[in-house]
Design a protein with these regions (language model features):
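N-terminal "arm"/small-domain region of PLP-dependent enzymes with the aminotransferase-like
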Residues: 1-56, 177
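Conserved N-terminal alpha-helix of the aminotransferase class I/II PLP-enzyme fold
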Residues: 38-81, 103
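Conserved beta-loop-alpha segment that forms the PLP phosphate-binding cup at the N-terminus of a helix
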Residues: 72-95, 111
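PLP-dependent aminotransferase-like
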Residues: 96-147, 151-153
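Active-site phosphate-binding strand-loop segment of PLP-dependent enzymes
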Residues: 130-188
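Active-site PLP attachment segment
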Residues: 199-236, 243-254
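Conserved PLP-dependent catalytic core of the aminotransferase class-I/II
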Residues: 259-288, 311
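Conserved C-terminal alpha-helix-loop-beta "cap" of PLP-dependent enzymes
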Residues: 282-404, 411-412, 418-432
Length: 447
């Protein structure tokens, strides 16, 4: 029998790849995962408790995940996705609407599809540094959240940028609106020198992907539930629906180890090595864009697209998180004493990259849709293709997703505006890859 996965990984690992991407253990060079033993991959035998009705060691382990006294921690073995789905489902029978940001993770939209409910899309602000969605436009937030049963925010964004989550949560709480914060990329927040976690804002539900920035196994996340959160019993019930009936003890144990790492972490060495890395990146001619989260670096090269930079890095077996037309994104390790991360080798390989001197190319800035909108769940049965320029006031029958960054810009069920048509034409005219548009045509609801 052919073994394509086994063979590929064996081949890949022989090249000694260096990780500047998730997961946070960075090819098992960060943290304490050497304490894991595959013999721990067991089932719920006597003494090992049950994640779906924890009364023993699993309950005690989760009680030890203390980041804020007002929250209880719940292990997620099906990723942050399972936590998001559970919270959305937990509010499905309540009156009112869901309200959310446009840069929500796809699991939010999947949750709305499963509940067959629509959502208000908030007006958005755009980052001047990265040209990505930053957060909601806070100038008239209170006017947009009327009759909201659950508000959903992404903090930080994928590129490591933060908005005023404290003010945002305060506005929602004063209006009596429950809040879910997708803090997938902020499990390390709260460490010295890093942004504050939204756990300090009183949000009702905060979900963190420990595996993205802390040293735990992929798919291991934690849902933090406030002691006064509405619908908490419902949400806890749905955690059993959206997670495997055979939860992995390896994943749960890795969460315990990662949290122990977090509680003991001293960030001084991290910032020393980060400074040295930034110096080398600048020395070889790259531009370093620093953002709110020190763990993320956005890198640009004069005359290079992000995709070209990615190829140059990969030629030296350095693997980054993502590339777009203008930059690449690095996710740094949480360096610590006794880590085995190949830092000196990374610097050597970076110095080996041969950058040609190029004239600066015109940046291809994707324009974002920032206006208020509505996301409609459910399937659209009758559809037809139509030229973009004839689509104003029609109903989109599919999502419009430019790649990268792979964020849904326009949503199935939205009414097409003149601004949307302008954006779609801009993307097509600049040869950007956009899922949902082909040869200046899109799918609309046939009415």
């Amino acid at each position: 029998m052919p073994k394509p996965l086994t063979n590929k990984f064996n081949e890949f690992l022989r090249q000694s790849p260096i990780s500047l991407h998730v997961p946070g253990h960075k090819n098992m060079t960060i943290g304490q995962l050497e304490q894991l033993d595959f013999k721990m991959d067991m089932t719920e035998i006597t003494g090992l408790d049950d994640l779906h009705q924890p009364e023993g060691i699993i309950l005690k382990s989760m009680e030890g995940i203390s980041k804020h006294p007002d929250y209880e921690a719940y292990y997620l073995v099906n990723g942050t996705t399972s936590g998001i789905l559970s919270v959305i489902q937990g509010f499905s029978e309540q009156r009112g609407k869901y309200t959310m940001v446009r840069n929500a993770h796809k699991s939010v939209f999947h949750g709305l599809e499963l509940t067959c409910q629509n959502a208000l899309l908030l007006e958005m602000d755009i980052s001047l540094k990265t040209n990505q969605y930053l957060g909601p436009d806070l100038s008239n937030l209170r006017d947009q959240i009327q009759d909201t049963k659950l508000a959903i925010f992404t903090y930080p964004n994928y590129y490591g940028e933060c908005f005023d989550i404290s003010y945002t949560t305060m506005q929602l709480k004063e209006a009596g609106v429950p809040v879910l914060i997708d803090e997938a990329h902020g499990a390390h927040f709260g460490l010295e020198g890093f942004p504050s976690s939204s756990l300090n804002t009183g949000a009702d539900y905060v979900v963190q992907s420990y595996h993205k920035s802390l040293p735990s196994l992929t798919m291991s996340s934690i849902l933090f539930i406030h002691k006064d959160a509405p619908q908490r019993k419902n949400v806890i019930k749905y955690l059993t629906y959206f997670q495997s009936s055979s939860p992995s003890y390896l994943l749960m144990t890795s969460l315990e180890l990662a949290h122990d790492f977090y509680k003991k972490y001293d960030s001084a060495l991290f910032f020393d090595k980060r400074y040295e890395l930034i110096s080398i990146l600048k020395q070889i001619g790259l531009e370093v864009i620093e953002v709110d989260d020190p763990l993320k670096l956005n890198i640009r090269g004069n005359g290079y697209t992000g995709f070209e930079l990615q190829k140059l890095f990969e030629m030296e077996n350095i693997y980054i998180e993502l590339a777009d037309n203008n930059q690449i994104l690095l996710v740094l390790p949480l360096w610590h004493e006794e880590d085995t991360y190949p830092f000196e080798l990374l610097l050597e390989r970076l110095k080996s990259i041969n950058f040609e001197k190029r004239k600066a190319h015109k940046k291809t800035e994707i324009e974002y849709l920032t206006e208020k909108g509505v996301y409609y769940s459910g399937e659209i049965d009758k559809i037809r293709n139509i030229n973009i320029n004839k689509s104003v006031n029609k109903i989109l029958a599919t999502h419009i997703v430019p790649y990268p960054p792979g964020i849904t810009f326009m949503f199935k069920g939205e009414k097409i505006t003149e601004n949307m048509v302008k954006l779609m034409n801009y993307w097509q005219d600049n040869n950007l890859r956009v899922e949902g548009i082909r040869n200046h045509k899109i799918e609309i609801k046939d009415e």
